[in-house]
From Swiss-Prot:
Residues 1-11 form the signal peptide. It comes from Mus musculus (Mouse). Residues 12-106 are annotated as: V segment. It holds the Pfam family V-set. GO terms for biological process: adaptive immune response; cell surface receptor signaling pathway. Disulfide bonds join C34-C102. Residues 107-120 are annotated as: J segment. Keywords: Adaptive immunity, Disulfide bond, Immunity, Immunoglobulin domain, Receptor, Signal, T cell receptor. GO terms for cellular component: plasma membrane; T cell receptor complex. This is T-cell receptor beta chain V region PHDS203.
Length: 120
């Protein structure tokens, strides 16, 4: 009898967000950048306000293929490479102060550490 065991350890999937904390003045442009290392086609941007769950802002199915989520007003996105997905606020408002999360993958999602944006 020959037994063969194949290693199936956890895969380390990384989602990076370039800034953990940002402070901007009202009316300034804001660029939130997200990167991933698994070349997933599907990526997401969410925001989470105190006491609320995640709210989907945008979803991207691949390069230059994006759909609005539940709260797209005041935001736009850019995805020129599969590994990068940026969220853009052209004129930041105080009500956009929140924690923003980028995620990759479908159906299982892997999240970045989040970026806390404060608009003064």
């Amino acid at each position: 009898v020959v037994l063969c065991f194949l290693g199936t350890g956890l895969v380390d999937m990384k989602v990076t967000q370039m800034s953990r904390y940002l402070i901007k003045r009202m009316g300034e442009n804001v660029l939130l950048e997200c990167g991933q290392d698994m070349s997933h086609e599907t990526m997401y941007w969410y925001r989470q306000d105190p006491g609320l769950g995640l709210q989907l802002i945008y979803i991207s199915y691949d390069v230059d293929s994006n759909s609005e989520g539940d709260i797209p007003k005041g935001y736009r996105v850019s995805r020129k490479k599969r590994e990068h997905f940026s969220l853009i606020l052209d004129s930041a408002k105080t009500n956009q102060t929140s924690v923003y999360f980028c995620a990759q993958g479908a159906p299982e999602q892997y999240f970045g550490p989040g970026t806390r944006l404060t608009v003064l």
